[in-house]
Amino acid sequence: MKLPRKVYLIDTNVVLRYLLGDHPEFSPKAETFMFDVSKGVKKAEILDVVIVECIYVMEKYYEIPKTEIVEKLSGILNFSGIVNPDRSEILEALLKYEN
């Protein structure tokens, strides 16, 4: 009998370390993990609250423009290994946030 694949729940820090590359220890680990998710080697879900937290930190603390934030987060949500059942709704909300 084949067991179901593990689905990882990605938190805000993993997303931020991956996108910002600002931590000497954790950013490379996040990059390796997210590379596997991008190729579908690992399956993962990113809750909508994590997306909201990422937006807040990138906009308020790092002063990243909305268009860049939306581009980065949309890119991640379109990784092969992302299994969010509400992916289309989150992507639509990102577009509304941008405008």
Predicted features, each with a name:
Residues 1-46, 62-71:
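Short, well-structured N-terminal submotif of metal-dependent ribonuclease cores
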Residues 3, 81-99:
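Active-site neighborhoods of divalent-metal-dependent phosphate/nucleic-acid chemistry enzymes
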Residues 14-15, 53-57, 75, 92:
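A general alpha-helix detector
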Residues 27-30, 51, 90:
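A general structural signal for well-ordered alpha-helical segments in protein cores
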Residues 36-37, 76, 96:
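Hydrophobic helix-cap positions at the C-terminus of alpha-helices
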Residues 46-50, 86-89:
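Short, conserved alpha-helical segments within structured domains
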Residues 55-81:
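Active-site-proximal, substrate-binding regions of enzyme catalytic domains
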